[in-house]
Amino acid sequence: MANHSSAKKAARQTVKRTLINKKRSSAIKTFIKKVVHEISIGNKENANIALSVAQSKIMQGVKKNIIKLNTASRKISRLSRQIKSLKVNNTL
């Protein structure tokens, strides 16, 4: 355990930041799951709405250093591609 007061404070701050980061990370995952659920049931309108909300939350996570920019871009790209393929399949 930390002996100096500054080290004790740093330990407290680390615990606090860890909880906040876990909460934000969990929220991002939840929004992604909502998009995946809408894609799985084939509802393209709701999937697009859910994607726009999820995209906003993902980019907020990038801004807060929860996830990296390339990871966020990859997730958004893959979800968008799935929604786009949904539209093509439903029009045939």
From Swiss-Prot:
GO terms for biological process: translation. One of its GO terms (molecular function) is structural constituent of ribosome. Keywords: Ribonucleoprotein, Ribosomal protein, RNA-binding, rRNA-binding. The keyword Zinc does not apply. Pfam families: Ribosomal_S20p. The keyword RNA-binding applies. InterPro entries: Ribosomal_bS20 (IPR002583), Ribosomal_bS20_sf (IPR036510). GO terms for cellular component: small ribosomal subunit. Belongs to the bacterial ribosomal protein bS20 family. Binds directly to 16S ribosomal RNA. PANTHER family: 30S RIBOSOMAL PROTEIN S20 (PTHR33398), SMALL RIBOSOMAL SUBUNIT PROTEIN BS20C (PTHR33398:SF1). This is Small ribosomal subunit protein bS20. It comes from Rickettsia conorii (strain ATCC VR-613 / Malish 7). The gene is rpsT.
